[in-house]
Amino acid sequence: MITSYFKIAWRNLVKNKLHSFINISGLATGMGLAILIGIWILDELSFNRYHQNYTSIARIMVNQTFGDQVSTDVAIPLPLKDELKNNFSSDFKSMALASWEWDHSFTVNKTKISKPGMYVEPDFPKIFSLRMIRGSHDNALNEPTSVVISESVAKSFFGDEDPLNKTIVFDNDVNGKITGVFADLPRNSELSGVQVLLPWSLFLQQDWVKNSVTNWGNNSFQLFTQISDNAKFERITSKIKDIGEKYYPQSKPEYFLQPMKKWHLYSEFKNGKNAGGKITFVWLFGIIGLFILFLACINFMNLSTARSEKRAKEVGIRKATGSVRGQLVIQFFAESLSTTMSAFILSLFLVQLSLPFFNDLANKQMSVPWSNPLFWLAGIGFTLFTGLIAGSYPALYLSSFKPVKALKGTYRAGRFAALPRKVLVVLQFTVSIALIIGTMVVHQQIQFAKNRPIGYDNTGLIQLGSTEEIANSFEAFRSDLLKTGVVSEISGSSSPTTDIWGNRDDFTWEGKDPSLLPLIGLVSCTHEFGKTIGWKIINGRDFSEDFKMDSSAVILNEAAMELTGSKDIVGKLITDENSNRLHVIGVVKNLIMESPYSAIKPTFFVLGKDFRLVNIKLKTGVPVSIALSSVQGVFKKYNPEVSFDYKFADREFAKKFADEVRTSKLSAFFASLAIMISCLGLFGLVSFVAEQRTREIGIRKVLGASISGVVALLSKDFLKLVTIAFLIACPVSWFFMHRWLENYTYRANLSWWMFVLAGLLALFIALVTLSFQSIRAAIANPVKSLRTE
């Protein structure tokens, strides 16, 4: 019996092909997008859950006050660990100091590769519950020369051999012993880039690290901890908050624990307070996914209820031939469920087909969780729910008709029967227009920041890590590069042009407020740095080897000049807490070295030979491949065993827009789908209205109505609904996009033309959709339509 209901339902789907296509394709698109967004959200929420101690791991962070600004950083001073251990040992199960992650060269026999690694204390593998394939958590890093490598690094060097106790040379001159191998960390771990762990005891032998053991002013290290079983993050934070103020009162440091579960989604801080982070995108895309799914469901329900009003006579015939109400209820529900199940199956195919594109768009490596029972439970549950809700109107309302009334055709929809459908159409286009506006605002903000002058020329500028060999023979290295004819200039620097790796707060100058402790970026460089990057001197002069006094010279950016309060700063002195005197020789235009959306940090540029990077300006007109080959030849002359790893400055700068560009692309993708689903629904509704008014259209044409008049008749009511949607979407979009733009110091204005353009675009798309079916109805033969009616 049940089978017959679904057979009849299938026949009805086939009979009404256009109606079925619109219903199934629209609902499948909405479901598919909701599944994709759901997979993306689950991936974001899964970050760091790989680590068994996920809920009890934290990193120590610090808020420091510089003038009227509070800076938040994960870098802490070296003596903090012992202070915490001596005073609050009962709150911590384990603690481990760590360096920052950077590339090291590793050599086994004659094989040499460069891999990211970090120096860590022995408890590090245990805190993060690394899955040890060889060796043990407890003693893997206990020896002074212990090295723990990832499984992929082990395969690169040893294949299937056991690497334990084998010798590995790192950074060209340190002999280490492999004492452990850990399973590669998944991409959804914050530590996924780390492939080698080096012994902390060896790190402590470096002079600058030794000098930091008691220095509370040198925030250059990381401290990870696993708290005790009964401890609470908030309670520990309240205890340790002011522990460093007595040692370094200048910046009023306040320490706190950030739980590992917040590292990925809550990574942004503003003026000492957590300002969210990627959790914003989780909420945003989650809401968008629900809205688009809602739009698809609206279409389905709208068209289902609209079509059901034409089936009153069918209900009368079936009742007259003996059908009872219960059978009709089951029949209508069977038809609705057949549609939703077909849509769900189609949505799974769409998801599988579009997943590579979506992964590329979202910069992910996601897959559909086919084996997860919750996935099927949620999908089938939602499908059944949607089918039951959409089928409830015809099932419960139409099945209640008296057969005589239905057969006579005296059934008429109520005066306000179309009102719910109109409201739902308005909702659909409100969401669609809002998404279009949001996409344009995000795009404008990106272009606004991209068009901001960066203060230097990054075209053809490459940067590579310096080595001891290059630093010791820099002038010879520079000379050899210039002789190749493919390079216009070379320089060394302590920071890349796309970041500032050094900061100080101890500088003073004439007229400075003693209570003011601004954080100033400090970049050490060689004489040719300005020429290499093409900065612009606006006052004074550049560094020059003709002036021996330049060894104590400093060049300020505009932001630093404004900080001093003197436009005539050139020629004046700046000193630090060690009474070192720097004389200002020049001022350069602001360089965007950090976020292009933020205010420029005051920065000092000084001469120094202790640089970590080499900046190379390639000559224009020389093919890049040829230029790089020549540079590599010189590099290998000085570093025959070090891999030639370089980065283009313009590409590194472009990465600063990655999140916003991704958001813009996803928003455009979502907006396109939303408007497509809305137009599918509009097309279905105008088809239904044209079918309902066939006799009226025929009479009007017989009486002389033009095609344009008939098109206007069928379209005007729907265009009014789109206009109402536009009027609602504008203030809603303005409110949310204004709030979003407030996250950026350097931001675009909300322009009125974007709202108008979004409205006109929505009206145009709606008009095209309406015109197709309206014109078809208008050119139909009136005699045929009147005879049919």
Locations of regions flagged by a protein language model:
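Membrane-helix entry/capping segments
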Residues: 1-11, 15, 19, 51, ...
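Intracellular coupling helices
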Residues: 6-22, 26, 296-339, 400-411, ...
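Short, strongly hydrophobic transmembrane alpha-helices
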Residues: 16-45, 418-445, 456, 681, ...
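Small-residue-rich transmembrane alpha-helices
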Residues: 32, 36-39, 256, 336-403, ...
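A hydrophobic alpha-helix feature that marks transmembrane segments and, especially
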Residues: 38, 287-315, 389, 394-395, ...
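Membrane-proximal juxtamembrane linkers immediately C-terminal to transmembrane helices
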Residues: 42-65, 88-90, 131, 190-191, ...
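Mid-to-C-terminal secondary-structure elements
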Residues: 121-134, 147-280, 476-659
